[in-house]
Structures are given as C-alpha cells and as structure tokens.
C-alpha cells in the first residue's frame, strides 16, 4: 500500500465554512427567532464532530446518489465530486418542533443554512474523504481528489453516520434504507466519546486496550488473508539473543495498516487524531517500534514503518496460555462488588472502553434512545451552563434551539426516539415547553427546562441501571447483582 501524507493545511477561508443560521417560524419579532454563529473549529481546522457529521449527513441526503457509468461498467449508489460541491453551495436543514401550549399546538420550525464558498466546499469534501466517510471508486485509499468528475461512494462508516442521523431525526424508513446498504455482519464502527467543550477524545489506557483487541482480535490469526476486517499480523522469526540455536517469534504490523484500520473502523475524524490515539499504544507499551532508533513514543505510518506486539500486548489479546480471552469480563469485575447498580453504571460511563461496549450493546438491542438522550442532555448541560455563566446571548439562543430539539426527538408525544419517564415529570416538561415562546426573559425559561432535563436524565440513568445494565452484565458474565 502506498505511503500516505498529511493533507495540506486548509485555507484561511475554511473557517467560513459556516454561516450557521437558525430561524424559528413563530413570533417574528421574538429574539428566539434568529441566531447565527460560526462553527467551532478544532486546532486541526475541522469543525467540531457534531456539526461536522450533521453537515456531512445533510449533504448526503440532499445529493442524488445513483447509478453512474465508470469505464466499462456501472457503479450503484455513487455520485461525482461536482455534485457534492453543487449541493454544498446552497445547503439547508429544516427541523420541525411541535410544542403543545394552552392555545393548542404550536410549530417551531428551525432552519439551519450553511453558506459555503466553492473553495471551502472542496476543502470540506476532502476532509470527509480523509475521515473515511467517502471513498473514490477507483482508489479507495486516496486522500486527495484527482478531479471534480471523480466518482464517489459512501464507505461503511459513512452509511453508518447517515443512518444514525436519519434515525435521530425520525426518518426511520430512510434510515433503514441507508443501513441496508452496508454489511451488517461486519463489526460495528467503534464510537468515540468526546468532551463537548473541546471536542477532544475521552481516552485512557483501557481505551487503548479495547482498540487493540478490536484491531487484532482475541483469536491468534497470522497473515493478511485470514480476516480482512482486522489489521494484518505477520509472524517473524529471529535468533534468540540468549541462545543462537533457538528462535524467537515476533508479531509484526505495518503502521499504514494500523492507521487505515483506525480511520475506517472508528469514529476518528482526522489523521492527527489517529496519530495521537496510535501513539498511546506506544506510550502504554502495547506495541513497539521494530527499529529501536526510531522516536519511541511517536506513531508513524510512513512507508515501510512497522511495529511489533510487546509481551503486554500479546497478554492483553489473550494470545498466551492461561490468560482469559474475555477482557471485558475482567474489566467489569474490577468494579467494586459492593457498589449499587447506579454506581456501577456511572463507573461504566466514566471508562471509555466499558462505555463503548455498553453503548454498542444498547444499539444492538434497539434500546439506545436512553443512551442518546443521556448524551444529549450532558452536552446541553455543558453548553447552557457556560452560556449562563458568561451571559452569552447568542449561546443562550442556541441553547433554546437545542432544548427544543431534545424535546422533539425524545420527549414529545410523537418523538421518534421516545424515552420512558415518570408521568409527573413528563407532564412538568410538557407544560413548561408550552411556555417556550411566552416566558421572558428567555434565560429564565431555560434555567427551569435545564433543571427538568437533568431530572429526566437522572430518571433515564435509573432506568438503565435497573434494566439494560443487568442484561449487559448477564450477557458478559459480569457481577451477579
């Protein structure tokens, strides 16, 4: 596989990828009606992950992916780069929030418009390509477009993102259509937990351990042809330093294979993030450079650079005798047995590796609306708390739109991802939402809905601790609680 190079830095205009405007269709004179903001940009020049994935999904569902001719055959579900650029020139996403009030039902329509110049649009599409959400038909590993007429398809990761976006917004039939286009027998894309304020990845040594098991598998397989969904591992024998007549077997991997696996099979969104995560595998001594003269703690995917599994890495994978292959059970059993169900769940949600396994379990069993509600309220809590402390009027209006979105998605009578709440709490939230366009000042209304959403989050956490957690522990042989 050819060596890959970091893409050139995005042009200064890239930060203008966004006139991100929200307008409400009610009470044209109300200050809730309109707000605009620049998308937050990471230090690597990429919009924060939530905006980035929403923008990608909106672009995809607004573009006609159809049957296109390529050389002497046809490619299904494809489009050209030119089509995507045309879509991005005038892209908007409309969401309708229905709020019951004393005067009947009100409709709050939120329209998000993205104003993106063509130069920035091309740069953005290249970022989608690097994130492995898109791929070029004749060169899936490419990280730059050859020309504007090149033919593109969604990757398995791209289909997963769009399907989840549609499901979140209540378009279940469309979500199923997108979900049906990728191989469900393949492993799920590994989710990545992030700090909402910085978009930085939540990670520790256990997160690295989980990724190592996902990359290489708990079953000892050597050679590239065994399992194409794992990083290829090659067996290399060399003379033992202690006895020249005996040989030592090492397990070799190439940096480019590790890099491609991380970008294609996890929700990492740029190659600098991938380098940081992969470097942690070196820092925590799961892998080591083949050549000790290399910089020991800096991961590289340059051509020819390879790594060996360390003894710690081999033991973590369970490739040695007398080691339990179920590392998840071992991690769950590290939780203190005297803990309550809720304390155990809170511990799982704090540990990146256990959180990933638990969220995947919920999704697999079609009950992930509780997890998504929990995560949305966490994000709302962080954003509104900061807006309230700094008295940022634009951020407060954004918090209003966010609160309405949470209500419409999880708590309204026709919510596509309804969560189960106590009837009295549900009634309190519904009654307060009815005053959404009436209470002044806006900050006063938000403070109360903030409290109610935190109460709802606690109720959902209790629900997961009493039901989903027990099933998760039972399935994985965890604590018998």
From Swiss-Prot:
Record-annotated DEP domain positions: 232-312
Sorted UniProt keywords: Cytoplasm, Nucleus, Pheromone response, Stress response
UniProt entry tagged with the keyword Lyase: no
Region (Fungal-DR): 33-227
SMART domains, alphabetized: DEP, RGS
A biological-process GO annotation: pheromone response MAPK cascade
InterPro entries listed in its UniProt record: DEP_dom, RGS, RGS_sf, RGS_subdomain_2
A Pfam family of this chain: RGS
Locations listed in the record: Nucleus; Cytoplasm
Ranges where the record places region Disordered: 1-31
RGS domain: residues covered: 344-474
Induction profile: By nitrogen starvation and pheromone.
Main location: nucleus
Name this protein carries in UniProt: Regulator of G-protein signaling 1
Species of the source: Schizosaccharomyces pombe (strain 972 / ATCC 24843)
Gene designation: rgs1
């Amino acid at each position: 596989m050819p060596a890959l190079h970091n893409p050139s830095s995005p042009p200064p205009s890239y930060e203008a990828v966004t006139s991100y405007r929200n307008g409400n269709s009610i009470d044209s004179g109300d200050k809730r009606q309109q707000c605009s903001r620049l998308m937050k940009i990471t230090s690597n020049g990429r919009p924060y992950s939530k905006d980035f994935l929403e923008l990608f999904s909106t672009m995809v569902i607004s573009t006609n992916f159809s049957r296109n001719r390529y050389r002497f055959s046809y490619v299904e579900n494809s489009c050209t780069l030119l089509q995507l650029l045309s879509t991005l020139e005038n892209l908007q996403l409309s969401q309708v929030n229905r709020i019951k009030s004393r005067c009947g039902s009100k409709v709050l329509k939120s329209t998000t418009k993205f104003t993106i110049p063509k130069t920035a649009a091309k740069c953005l599409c290249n970022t989608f390509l690097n994130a492995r959400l898109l791929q070029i038909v004749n060169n899936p590993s490419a990280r730059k477009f050859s020309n504007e007429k090149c033919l593109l398809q969604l990757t398995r990761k791209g289909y997963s993102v769009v399907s989840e976006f549609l499901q979140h917004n209540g378009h279940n039939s469309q979500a199923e259509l997108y979900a049906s286009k990728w191989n469900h027998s393949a492993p799920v894309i590994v989710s990545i937990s992030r700090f909402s304020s910085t978009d930085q990845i939540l990670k520790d040594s256990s997160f690295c351990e989980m990724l190592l098991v996902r990359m290489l598998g708990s079953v000892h397989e050597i050679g590239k042809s065994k399992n194409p969904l794992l990083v290829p591992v090659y067996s290399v024998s060399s003379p033992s330093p202690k006895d020249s007549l005996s040989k030592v077997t090492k397990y070799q991997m190439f940096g480019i294979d590790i890099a491609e696996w991380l970008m294609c099979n996890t929700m990492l969104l740029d190659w600098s993030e991938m380098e940081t995560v992969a470097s942690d595998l070196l820092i925590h001594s799961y892998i080591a450079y083949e050549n000790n003269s290399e910089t020991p703690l800096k991961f590289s995917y340059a051509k020819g650079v390879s790594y060996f599994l360390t003894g710690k890495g081999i033991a973590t994978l369970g490739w040695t005798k007398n080691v339990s292959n179920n590392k998840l059970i071992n991690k769950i059993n590290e939780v203190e047995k005297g803990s309550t169900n809720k304390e155990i769940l809170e511990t799982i949600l704090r540990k990146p590796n256990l959180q990933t396994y638990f969220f995947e379990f919920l999704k697999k069993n079609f009950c992930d609306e509780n997890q998504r509600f929990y995560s949305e309220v966490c994000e709302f809590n962080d954003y509104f708390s900061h807006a309230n402390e700094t008295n940022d009027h634009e951020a407060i209006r954004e918090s209003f739109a966010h609160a309405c979105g949470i209500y419409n998605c999880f708590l309204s009578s026709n919510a596509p991802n309804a969560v189960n709440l106590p009837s009295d709490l549900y009634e309190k939230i519904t009654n307060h939402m009815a005053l959404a366009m009436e209470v002044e000042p806006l900050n006063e209304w938000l403070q109360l809905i903030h409290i109610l959403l935190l109460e709802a989050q606690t109720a959902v956490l209790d629900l997961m601790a009493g039901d989903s957690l027990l099933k998760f522990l039972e399935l994985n042989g965890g604590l018998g609680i």
